[in-house]
């Protein structure tokens, strides 16, 4: 993690507010805060980050739980240390609890050998048990199943969730095609045909449609290398997208084919930013969503509600502009396609 814009302090603001509001657990990230402390090691091994900053400067006394696999997997900056040494360094830095690690023999040996004191172990035990006591887990650890139906999946909660989905939808472009009229002939690619039939007449040929509606998932160009020969890490590398925000050639070719008659509406899932410049130019309507249900998308397309969402981040115009921006500054890429907070309505 680097801070070419000098914004290390800016990134502390949410942590400060959370700690003020009685935060119980913090998980240090895998990354190395390059050039910010007296040694370039990952957060979980970094005494300045965990002790000097969190404990002393910010007065945090909750649990510090490591991210998953910092001892046997993602131990950035301390690769040369043995497993036992990584445990020792992370405990002395301030870790209370380990995510994804389960071999306690190393901890026991460190205490027996006098490298870690029981007093230090008890500090972490106190913090961990305090959270459990405050939750009442030792007084009544069981759930009253009879109350579940009144607490979980209630109609009020369902309606609130659906309304939140509606409010999240961002209308990015509308060249007079939206909202669609109920009963319009539509060709659908990537969305539920069953849901589509409730709003329009489904056709099999895009040439016969009044509108072509194409849904695109979050941009995901291949798998990032895990760099480790561990099944869990290799599995994770199939879940998370790499850094390229361009859609692949297959998707772009399909968009180009659909856009010939100027009646294409693209719905793109924006769980992360994407390069949308060419899609904007090829479509008559462009909508950004954030994991909403297909039915909610159709409700918006057919005017059952007026989109009011705003972008929570900017949409860059190219990968070149992304690579040239400062990593610790938000929304500073050159000539973004859409700025932070952008969103229009019908």
Regions found by a protein language model. Name each.
Residues 15, 60, 138, 203-206:
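Aromatic-residue hotspot detector
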Residues 118-140:
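Mid-to-C-terminal alpha-helical segments outside catalytic/metal-binding sites
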Residues 21-24, 59-61, 93, 125, ...:
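Short coil/turn connectors at secondary-structure junctions
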Residues 138-147, 217:
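Flexible hinge/switch segments at interdomain interfaces of large molecular machines
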Residues 24, 96, 116, 134-138, ...:
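Intrinsically disordered or highly flexible coil/loop and linker segments, enriched in small
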Residues 1-100, 104-109, 117-120, 127:
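Second-shell residues forming the walls of enzyme active-site clefts
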């Amino acid at each position: 993690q680097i801070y070419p814009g000098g914004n290390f302090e800016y990134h502390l603001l949410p942590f400060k507010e959370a700690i003020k509001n009685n935060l119980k657990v913090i998980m240090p990230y895998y990354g190395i805060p390059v050039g910010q402390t007296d040694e370039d090691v990952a957060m979980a091994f970094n005494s300045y980050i965990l002790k000097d900053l969190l404990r002393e400067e910010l007065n945090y006394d909750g649990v510090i739980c490591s991210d998953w696999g910092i001892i046997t997997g993602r131990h950035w900056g301390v690769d040369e240390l043995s497993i036992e040494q990584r445990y020792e360094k992370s405990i002395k830095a301030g870790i209370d609890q380990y995510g994804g690690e389960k071999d306690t023999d190393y901890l026991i040996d460190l205490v027996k050998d006098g490298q870690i004191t029981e007093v230090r172990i008890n500090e972490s035990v106190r913090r961990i048990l305090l959270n459990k006591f405050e939750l009442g887990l030792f007084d009544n650890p069981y759930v009253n199943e009879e109350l579940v139906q009144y607490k979980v999946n209630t109609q009020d909660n369902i309606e609130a969730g659906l309304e939140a989905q509606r409010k999240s939808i961002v209308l990015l472009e509308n060249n007079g095609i939206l909202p669609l009229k109920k009963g319009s002939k539509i060709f659908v690619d990537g969305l539920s045909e069953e849901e589509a039939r409730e709003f329009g007449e489904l056709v099999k040929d895009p040439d016969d449609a009044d509108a072509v509606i194409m849904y695109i998932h979050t941009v995901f160009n291949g798998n990032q290398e895990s760099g480790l020969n561990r099944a869990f890490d290799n599995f994770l590398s199939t879940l998370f997208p790499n850094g390229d925000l361009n859609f692949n050639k297959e998707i772009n070719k399909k968009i180009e084919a659909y856009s010939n008659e100027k009646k294409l509406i693209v719905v793109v899932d924006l769980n992360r930013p994407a390069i949308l410049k060419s899609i904007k130019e090829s479509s008559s309507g462009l909508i950004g969503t954030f994991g909403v249900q297909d039915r909610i998308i159709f409700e918006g397309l057919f005017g059952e509600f007026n989109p009011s969402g705003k972008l929570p981040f900017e949409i860059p115009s190219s990968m070149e502009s992304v690579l040239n921006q400062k990593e610790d500054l938000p929304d500073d890429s050159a000539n973004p396609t859409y700025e932070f907070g952008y969103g229009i309505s019908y």
